[in-house]
């Protein structure tokens, strides 16, 4: 039976060098804990898409609409990416390099998560930056640093030639993350005060920073790093953070935008813009 063979593969930690997509799919599905961490996100992403479309049906202000579009892209990207993961399309078994706790073993690597993050987290930052009344330069810097963080994180996960190089890529990714944190905690926090959106911004800022800090921590503890946690546990940690950092975050943001559309419009017209030094609002 393929299911039994897949279960033996995961249990033993050793797999053939060339697994077909069907074999990877069976391996993922045979691990109930791992598979459930993916299916739950597909279900919640689908429900979130329907809910957010309904919430935004009467929004008329262009800036508020742009926030809605950026936020709606988050579950749209997630449902696509998690479908890729659950199908085995964006999952590989990679042999860990010498020095790794699982050196020589083929470890399931759901690298498709990095595609999710590279496409969805910039949308989160765009939505938050627009809410804060940020200018184009800060938005661009945050988004580029965020994409750099995700791409170098992917490089860390896929590097099999050297265990040290995996951690070098990890350190570079964390450096990009520091740039994102600085903009969120310093630049945009001040902009939001000027824009009159500080209350909701501070809530979203804390939610984002606390949860996003969890990703590099679980990477380091998971099979890709120190291998203290197995693949299924790490997958649930990522999925749990995704649920709160994406869907709950998006709901809180969009609910506030719907109830405070006039405030958002004032930011767009420059009445509360946090763009200091005469810089234009991000959507001008």
Swiss-Prot record:
The keyword Ribonucleoprotein does not apply. One of its GO terms (cellular component) is plasma membrane. PANTHER family: BACTERIORHODOPSIN _OPSIN, NOPA (EUROFUNG), PTHR28286. Residues 1-30, 87-110, 160-162, 222-230 are extracellular. The chain crosses the membrane at residues 31-56, 63-86, 111-132, 136-159, 163-185, 198-221, 231-259. GO terms for molecular function: monoatomic ion channel activity; photoreceptor activity. It comes from Halobacterium sp. (strain SG1). Keywords: Cell membrane, Chloride, Chromophore, Ion transport, Membrane, Photoreceptor protein, Receptor, Retinal protein, Sensory transduction, Transmembrane, Transmembrane helix, Transport. It is a multi-pass membrane protein. This is Halorhodopsin. Residues 57-62, 133-135, 186-197, 260-284 are cytoplasmic. GO terms for biological process: phototransduction. It is found in: Cell membrane. The lineage of its organism: Archaea, Methanobacteriati, Methanobacteriota, Stenosarchaea group, Halobacteria. Light-driven chloride pump. CDD domains: 7tm_Halorhodopsin. It holds the Pfam family Bac_rhodopsin. Its main location: membrane. The modification N6-(retinylidene)lysine is found at residue 246.
